[in-house]
């Protein structure tokens, strides 16, 4: 089966052809937003990170922003740097450039302030839009699709209808050679043993058990019980009685394919060393902004 998309220099195929304007730190977000508002065809990938964080957190933010920039739906990138942030904006530029994707960078402090940076950014973003606007869609195989799947407003019918349909779609794409990612580690509780039985080997099974136990351990270290937050009031109103019942419905969206492995939050499907195929778990929170960002960072062109 085929679809039509935008072939990238790294071999991936996008369903969209957007210029992403990415602030390297929250302090540059207003400038990035002003640029996006003045350039048709540009989208802003705003966030509240990048400063006054510990080194492991800053590395994760940098890795995530690089992953978002390398998503196949992004045709070109403008990085908006402040100049004194903790994130590694130079590495962002280098890795995006090394992947063959058109990229520009502006520095607010280096340019002499906000107004000059906005003007320079508008020029740069508009130039990138012009640069990629002539690219045409071409035929690609469905095996090049990376699909991410997530629950939405779970209720008593999720495990009987919507998640079953998602599971069928996931199995179909895997059978065609594509990649499917699912996450929401908080919604594996009580059903992790079922996922572990679907692992391709014992190492993957152990990893699935570990991420669930580690998530619960972190909550307990703060004096919290995950079962006090799950299921949510909306889930209960919809007919769910426990986190175990919610999890049993949630995991149905992954279908029945063998689970190939567990990906860390900023980990990407496509790297210079490999292209992950089949069904994968991504260790993520259940909250939409975090999980959807993580899925886009992995390279998902489509989210359901």
Write out the residue ranges for each language-model feature.
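Metallocofactor- and cofactor-centric catalytic cores in central/energy metabolism, strongly enriched
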Residues: 1-150, 154-304
